[in-house]
Amino acid sequence: MSATFNFCAGPAMLPKPVMDKAQSELLDWNSMGTSVMEISHRSKEFIALTNQAEADLRQLMDIPANYHVLFMHGGGRGQFSAIANNFLGDKGRALYLVDGSWSSAAVEEAKKLVGEENIDTINIVENNNGINSVVLPSLSNIDKDYRYLHYCPNETVDGIEIFDTINSPWPVIADMSSNILSRKIDVNQFALIYAGAQKNIGPSGLSIVIVRNDMLSLPSLPQSSIMDYKLAVKHGSMYNTPPTFAWYLAAEVFAWLKVSGGVDSVELINIEKAMRLYQCIDELDFYKSGVAVENRSRMNVTFQLVNAELDNQFLEEAKQAGLVALKGHRSVGGMRASIYNAMPIEGVIELVKFMQTFAKKHS
């Protein structure tokens, strides 16, 4: 069977060594005679797994001791509401920077919970002649007492990534669902980082929250206990039964990242993958990108065929070549190649070859 490269935006492909290991021990994990899916989340064996997972993530991201690491339910959308509920009690206000679909969705969820009057927004994307670019605003002259500033550094739908530091007088919260562990960051610059697991961490159903301890003293709203950060901290992310298999796979992904050289090494590979793909798009008149060079995502490469009538044929021939899930999000159309950490560079090389051949064939 020839290799298939899965460019799905999420749930995304997992590293093959992780999948192979999970397959080999699915029915007998840790020599227990049972699957990891079948054991108690409070057993000493599973607790050891969770402790190692947190230790590995702390090492990979250099997470300081004054930050808690939580493994929670709900994915990114669950955290949209959890953030507002945990931090915006007593009529708290927040500022949201909007650079695409997911930051917009976070805004709408927060407004539902605390009202439009308590959520301010700034659109930070400008479109010039069909090219989107990010323009970060000066925040020093805004005289408002926000509990936090929220933004999404990588917008999967739009293919936009923010690499610059957000200089904010308020605590910064970042939705890193799609670029966590893809490049080195300074965790100290953030009050909270959250990520749905299904892109760079593991399967869907799990979310990671990295929250600075002082944030837990902010007034909160009444909410579901399973999304209460204070309760999650108090109970070691086990106030209720967690998604154990997703946690297990996340632990294996963290271990794989360490063996692969850590975030520094993975970042270099991610730069190379994105460079090859964008170079192909730019060099051929057959394709076009709608994102400014400085804001092109390394994780989600969006592009269009100049002749959109060939879109379906492109997708069908790509599928026949073992290159799947390249269709752009339904809200924007075009193509999208999601090249998260698990995508080997060989997959990008094969995609570039296909794009070159397809362009030559139909030019």
From Swiss-Prot:
Q: Which cofactors, if any, are listed as required?
A: pyridoxal 5'-phosphate
Chain positions with N6-(pyridoxal phosphate)lysine modification: 199
Q: What is its EC number?
A: 2.6.1.52
User: Where along this sequence does the record place binding of L-glutamate?
Assistant: 42
| Domain of life, source organism | Bacteria
Instruction: Name the major location.
Output: cytoplasm
Question: Which catalytic reaction applies to this protein?
Answer: O-phospho-L-serine + 2-oxoglutarate = 3-phosphooxypyruvate + L-glutamate; 4-(phosphooxy)-L-threonine + 2-oxoglutarate = (R)-3-hydroxy-2-oxo-4-phosphooxybutanoate + L-glutamate
Q: Cite the entry's keywords alphabetically.
A: Amino-acid biosynthesis, Aminotransferase, Cytoplasm, Pyridoxal phosphate, Pyridoxine biosynthesis, Serine biosynthesis, Transferase
The protein's location, in the record's own words, is: Cytoplasm
- GO molecular function term, any single one: pyridoxal phosphate binding
Record text on cofactor binding: Binds 1 pyridoxal phosphate per subunit.
Q: What does this protein do?
A: Catalyzes the reversible conversion of 3-phosphohydroxypyruvate to phosphoserine and of 3-hydroxy-2-oxo-4-phosphonooxybutanoate to phosphohydroxythreonine.
Q: Which family does it belong to?
A: Belongs to the class-V pyridoxal-phosphate-dependent aminotransferase family. SerC subfamily.
Cited HAMAP family: SerC_aminotrans_5 (MF_00160)
Q: Quaternary structure?
A: Homodimer.
Q: By what name is this protein known?
A: Phosphoserine aminotransferase
Species, as recorded:
Shewanella piezotolerans (strain WP3 / JCM 13877)
Q: Which gene encodes it?
A: serC
